[in-house]
Amino acid sequence: MAKPGARIIITLECTECRTNTAKRRPGVSRYTTTKNKRNTTGRMELKKFCPNCNKHTVHKETK
């Protein structure tokens, strides 16, 4: 049998939704994805589309 993998499921949250009050609709945009914790030891930051802000924003990994 294979060893338990190094891949974990993480949540990415929009950084502008927390501070921006003038947005399209209320709430915070969240995406889930996986990462290999051996190769990517730090927190991930990706630019993804936020439907609440209606634009591409930086999404940071949450704990």
UniProtKB/Swiss-Prot annotation:
GO BP term, pick one: translation
Example of a GO MF term: structural constituent of ribosome
Keyword Transferase: no
Gene Ontology cellular component terms for the protein in this record: cytoplasm; ribonucleoprotein complex; ribosome
Transmembrane segments: none
UniProt entry keywords in alphabetical sequence: Ribonucleoprotein, Ribosomal protein
Superkingdom of origin: Bacteria
The UniProt record lists the keyword ATP-binding: no
Entry-linked Gene3D superfamilies: Ribosomal protein L33
Similarity field: Belongs to the bacterial ribosomal protein bL33 family.
Name of protein: Large ribosomal subunit protein bL33
Organism: Gloeobacter violaceus (strain ATCC 29082 / PCC 7421)
